[in-house]
């Protein structure tokens, strides 16, 4: 039995498919990026564009099985998952909310790991 407080679980395929479709479409009206996520990604990669970040996030969610951690207690309603992604060979932490409509995502986090590279 795992004593890990937040074990990594498979992220549901339906959630991943919806989020990837929104990220790949790239419509600003469907992607809310919180200021912290925008600032931290831009600080680490000042020459990157939003579509670069979105593409890296989508690529991370595309494999058949992706492990992550469900997140509860966010202000906005929806299903939130944290997971790892890579951009320019740098491991990054992501946290994304797929809102109940299934047509809008909120990117809360897109930054280098703050709690170590093994803790989501």
Model-derived regions, located:
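Basic/aromatic recognition patch in beta-strand/loop cores that engages polyanionic ligands
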Residues: 72-100
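Enriched for short, Lys/Arg-rich terminal
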Residues: 91-120
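Compact soluble domain cores
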Residues: 2-10, 14-77
């Amino acid at each position: 039995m795992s004593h890990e407080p937040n074990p990594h679980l498979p992220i549901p395929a339906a959630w991943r498919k919806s989020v990837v479709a929104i990220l790949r479409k790239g419509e600003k009206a469907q992607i809310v990026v919180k200021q912290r996520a925008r600032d931290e990604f831009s600080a680490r990669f000042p020459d990157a564009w939003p579509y670069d970040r979105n593409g890296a996030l989508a690529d991370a969610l595309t494999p058949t099985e992706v492990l992550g951690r469900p997140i509860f207690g966010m202000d906005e309603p929806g299903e939130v998952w944290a997971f790892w992604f890579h951009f320019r060979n740098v491991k990054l932490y992501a946290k994304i909310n797929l809102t109940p409509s299934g047509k809008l995502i909120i990117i809360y986090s897109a930054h280098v790991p703050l709690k170590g590279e093994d803790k989501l």
